[in-house]
From Swiss-Prot:
PANTHER family assigned: DELTA-1-PYRROLINE-5-CARBOXYLATE SYNTHASE (PTHR11063:SF8), GLUTAMATE SEMIALDEHYDE DEHYDROGENASE (PTHR11063)
Gene coding for it: proA
Species annotation: Acinetobacter baumannii (strain SDF)
GO CC list: cytoplasm
Predominant localisation class: cytoplasm
Keyword Plastid on entry: no
SUPFAM superfamilies in alphabetical order: ALDH-like
Pathway per the UniProt entry: Amino-acid biosynthesis; L-proline biosynthesis; L-glutamate 5-semialdehyde from L-glutamate: step 2/2
GO biological process, one term: L-proline biosynthetic process
Name the UniProt record assigns to this protein: Gamma-glutamyl phosphate reductase
Role description: Catalyzes the NADPH-dependent reduction of L-glutamate 5-phosphate into L-glutamate 5-semialdehyde and phosphate. The product spontaneously undergoes cyclization to form 1-pyrroline-5-carboxylate.
Length: 421
């Protein structure tokens, strides 16, 4: 079986590399034609795709997947409509490929500039969410990259159904069907091969829990753009407008629990904790959110709060649980975020411009937010159309990774017979 998995992955890799050589020079109109054909194929096959998703959901329930995982797995008609809208948005995006920037003459008479080009072949490993299959595929096609998708075994039927529509659209447009491939085995050995096939794959994008990210980081022989967990914070500073702070902190936690940009720890300045905490605790109680707090939080709110442990400050709950800490001010809040956070998305609520600027400068996260919910940390909300992930790395791409994050630049030199003296 091991040999057959290796042979299968080698074939997938070779097909992706061959497809990437065609895609890299595909015109914008051809790529958009393919994406439009994919849109039509998805529309025509909505019932079949949702039925495939229900098979995954039934398996998930029988395997006792937790509610957060099931929420991410489910494709409702509304979410399917959102997927289609995301695809429309990608079609409307400006194609970055071939763009030449920084063109300038040198004293020798040559012109030097930079041209934006595809990365080549992207390998993506992700869990649960079948909508990621379409988002990643559409961004890869638009940016001229081939992509190999390894979704979670819990979403295999959904991913295969979506991939069929994608293949149909590529075929209609005359682009290689293997530009987008879903690995159709749940064997974990496939991941091991994917992250070490340097001859075929140019970059790996893992989206998932710490164990997945650690495995990929430790074993990959290919550059990695990590999408780590989202241990996000909101700090309600002493000069916050509480009419803003209440809806922001409620939305950041309860809008959707099982997403990486949901707040997991609430930090409150000690100067307003006595006033603010009882109000927000009442709103959380209505949503049945369990609070785990520091001793000062417990003193203010009483026995409705469970004691927080050191582990709670590090935890991405992905559910109706929230850690709460009262801090002495902005310095302690920033220190806490930089120590316990995952460098994903963190927010401050304040009317003090100087402190807001300080927070923006000192918090070491891919997205830093002032007076808004952490839930805005998303490629669609940032105007990227869709995202392949939210990078918590600092090299190449950081934050939501859209079209430009799937490209690099090469130097171009334009001459008229010049030789080096």
């Amino acid at each position: 079986m091991q040999d057959s998995i290796e042979q299968y992955m080698q074939k997938v890799g070779q097909q992706a590399r061959d497809a990437s050589r065609v895609l890299t020079s595909a015109s914008t109109s051809l790529k958009n034609h393919a994406l439009s054909a994919i849109y039509t194929a998805l529309e025509n096959n909505q019932a079949a795709i949702l039925a495939a998703n229900q098979i995954d959901m039934e398996k998930g329930r029988s395997n006792q997947l937790d509610s957060a995982l099931l929420d991410r797995l489910e494709l409702t008609p509304a979410r399917f409509k959102g997927m289609l809208q995301g695809l429309k948005d990608v079609i409307a995006l400006v194609d970055p490929i071939g763009e030449i920037t920084d063109l300038a003459y040198r004293p020798t008479g040559i012109q030097i500039g930079k041209m934006r080009v595809p990365l080549g072949v992207v390998g993506m490993i992700y869990e649960s969410r079948p909508n990621v299959t379409l988002e990643a595929a559409s961004l890869a096609i638009k940016s001229g990259n081939a992509i190999i998708l390894r979704g979670g075994s819990e979403a295999l039927e959904s991913n295969k159904a979506i991939a069929e529509a994608v293949k149909h659209g590529l075929k209609v447009a005359g682009l290689p069907e293997h530009s987008v491939q879903v690995i159709e085995t749940s064997d974990r050995a496939a991941v091991g091969h994917l992250i070490t096939m340097a001859e075929y794959v140019d970059v790996i994008v893992p989206r998932g829990g710490k164990s997945l990210i650690e495995r990929v980081t430790n074993e990959a022989r290919i550059p990695v753009i990590k999408h780590l967990d989202g241990n996000c914070h909101v700090f309600v500073e002493a000069q916050a407008d509480l009419q803003k702070a209440l809806p922001i902190t409620l939305n950041a936690k309860t809008h959707r629990y099982g997403v990486c940009n949901a707040m997991e720890t609430l930090l409150v300045d000690e100067k307003i904790a006595e006033v603010f905490l009882p109000h927000i605790a009442e709103l959380y109680a209505e949503k049945q959110v369990e609070l785990r707090g520091c001793p000062e939080t417990h003193r203010i709110l009483g026995t409705t709060v469970k004691p927080a442990t050191e582990e709670d400050w590090y935890t991405e709950y992905l559910g109706p649980i929230l850690a709460v800490k009262v801090v002495s001010g902005i310095d302690e809040a920033i220190d806490h975020i930089n120590k316990y956070g995952s460098h994903h998305t963190d927010a401050i609520v304040t009317e003090n411009y100087t402190l807001a600027r300080q927070f923006l400068a000192r918090v070491d996260s891919s997205s830093v937010v002032v007076n808004a919910s952490t839930r805005f940390a998303d490629g669609f909300e940032y105007g990227l159309g869709a995202e392949i992930g939210i990078s918590t790395d600092k090299i190449h791409a950081r934050g939501p990774v859209g079209l430009e994050g799937l490209t690099s630049q090469k130097w171009i030199v334009l001459g008229d017979g010049q030789i080096r003296q």
